[in-house]
């Protein structure tokens, strides 16, 4: 369901950006969503992404085009428990958020935007929204992102009521075997073998956590944490580990793939529906701007190196 057509602007206005743009107030928003109904986070032609719903709700309230910047894009079918975005408002827009209520601007916006997003039957919901600390950038200030992935291994654990958030795997899995695989790829590496690379983008990442454990219900929960994840990286790592679990590949497969730095028929993606973006980590407020500057600088260097490699 679309709150407003993507290709029309009924307000006759555009996003801020001209030379006479007033001073802006940055807003920080934390939201969750059920990704099953959407074609991923990003806006795309002819399909509905979560970004479109959030921006259209904001545009309805603010009465102009709004662009949100996200901490990490999620693919089609992938969920988020605590996704983080930022967007900018003028002081007039910020102070006008309460309208006739006694609420402060942040809580007022929280109530109003959830009133609109509630039309999506709770598939998208804002947990927090308020004025951001100075220097905050949802994408570049982030220190790390953490994902989880649920697997019901063995048919005795299959539960139809949890199938939309759980991968069903017929055989029981040796998690000690898979944890040994996971340990072999921790650290800073070029994860090209596990990523769908984008032009001028680096595939070097620092994988801080990759662990298989059993929850109280007996199902497996996989936890992955990294400074950032490139496209398809989480699902490719889990897919590779499951090839070892099935016996189709020998132990040491993930480390071997990491060293090869190649994508081929062995680059198998795990299903998207059990994958959840759980949390985005940020430094203390007084370190936000420095972290954003450092991340941008690293990205610029990586892009320059990528271009040199094409010469």
Where do the protein language model's features map onto the residues?
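Structured-RNA-binding interfaces characteristic of tRNA pseudouridine synthases
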Residues: 2-311
């Amino acid at each position: 369901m679309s709150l407003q057509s993507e290709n029309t602007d009924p307000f006759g206005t555009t996003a801020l950006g001209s030379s006479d743009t007033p001073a802006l107030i940055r807003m920080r928003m934390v939201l969750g969503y059920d990704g099953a109904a959407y074609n991923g986070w990003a806006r795309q032609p002819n399909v509905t992404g979560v970004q479109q719903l959030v921006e259209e709700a904001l545009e309805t309230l603010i009465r102009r085009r709004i662009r949100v910047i996200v901490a990490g894009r999620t693919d089609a079918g992938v969920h988020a428990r605590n996704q983080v975005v930022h967007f900018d408002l003028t002081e007039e827009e910020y102070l006008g958020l309460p309208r006739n209520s006694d609420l402060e601007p942040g809580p007022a916006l929280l109530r109003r935007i959830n009133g609109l997003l509630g039309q999506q039957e709770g598939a998208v919901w804002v947990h927090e929204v308020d004025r951001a600390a100075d220097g905050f950038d949802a994408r570049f200030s982030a220190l790390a992102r953490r994902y989880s992935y649920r697997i019901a291994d063995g048919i005795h654990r299959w539960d139809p009521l949890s199938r939309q958030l759980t991968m069903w795997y017929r055989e029981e899995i040796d998690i000690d075997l898979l944890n040994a695989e996971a340990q072999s790829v921790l650290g800073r590496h070029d994860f090209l073998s596990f990523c769908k690379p984008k032009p001028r983008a680096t595939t070097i990442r620092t994988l801080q956590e990759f662990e298989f454990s059993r929850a109280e219900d007996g199902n497996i929960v996989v936890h992955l944490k990294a400074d950032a994840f490139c496209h398809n990286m989480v699902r490719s790592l889990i897919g590779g580990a499951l090839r070892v679990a099935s016996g189709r590949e020998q132990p040491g497969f993930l480390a071997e793939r990491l060293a090869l730095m190649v994508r081929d028929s062995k680059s198998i993606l795990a299903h998207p529906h059990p994958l959840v973006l759980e949390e985005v980590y940020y430094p203390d407020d007084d370190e936000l701007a420095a972290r954003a500057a450092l991340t941008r600088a690293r990205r610029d260097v990586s892009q320059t190196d990528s271009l040199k490699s094409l010469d």
